[in-house]
């Protein structure tokens, strides 16, 4: 996938989640 410039180590994907990104390996991917 494409990195969404948001991490999800402590909190889940927030802004990028609205763009269809999901958490994988502590990073939000599209």
Curated annotation (Swiss-Prot):
GO biological process: defense response
UniProt keyword Disulfide bond present: yes
Protein's UniProt keywords contain Nucleus: no
Record location of the Cyclopeptide (Gly-Asn) cross-link: 1-30
Pfam family, one: Cyclotide
Key words of the record: Disulfide bond, Knottin, Plant defense
Family matches, as SUPFAM superfamilies: Cyclotides (SSF57038)
Coiled coil (residue ranges): none
Domain of life: Eukaryota
Record family assignment: Belongs to the cyclotide family. Bracelet subfamily.
Post-translational modification: This is a cyclic peptide.
Function: Probably participates in a plant defense mechanism.
The protein's name in its UniProt record: Cyclotide hypa-A
Disulfide bonds: 4-21, 8-23, 13-28
Notes on the domains: The presence of a 'disulfide through disulfide knot' structurally defines this protein as a knottin.
């Amino acid at each position: 996938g494409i990195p969404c410039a948001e991490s999800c180590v402590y909190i889940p994907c927030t802004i990028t989640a609205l763009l269809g990104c999901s958490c994988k390996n502590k990073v939000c991917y599209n």
